[in-house]
Amino acid sequence: ILVTPDIISRVVEKSFEFKCAAVGVPVKDTIKIIDMNSFIESTPNRSSLWAVQTPQVFEKKVYMNALENAKKLKQNYTDDCQLIENNGGKVYILKGDYTNIKLTTVDDVEYAKMMFENRGVNRWG
C-alpha cells in the first residue's frame, strides 16, 4: 500500500498545527547500540523508539533556515526530521502504517514489488 491519502491528510493537518510533522510507527524489534568492534554496548528502551516514515512536512521558513544552517556547517542528514531537530526544531510524529515503507535500498524496492504483486498490482517496468 505504501502511503495512503489518509496519512497524507493527517500529517499535513498536524504540520499546520505544529509547523513540523512526520509519520512513524513504533519499533517492533529490539534495537542494540554496538561499539566499533561489534559488541553490544546498550539496549535503548523500545517504548520510546519509532521508525520515521514519509511524508515529512515542514513550514517552509523553518525548513529553509535549517537547510541553510546545514549547508554552512557542511552537515548531512539521513532524513529531513534530523535536519530540523539538529537545528533546534521540534517535529511532531503521528502514527502511520507498517505498510508505508521507505524505499531506500534495493531490498526495499524488491519488498515493495512483492507487496504490490501480492495485492494484484503490477506497475513496475
Task: State where each predicted segment sits.
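Conserved core of the sugar-phosphate nucleotidyltransferase
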Residues: 2-94, 125
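Glycine-rich phosphate/pyrophosphate-binding loop and the adjoining helix
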Residues: 90, 97, 114
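A short, conserved beta-strand element in the Rossmann-like catalytic core
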Residues: 1-2, 100
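Hydrophobic helical membrane-anchoring modules
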Residues: 100-125
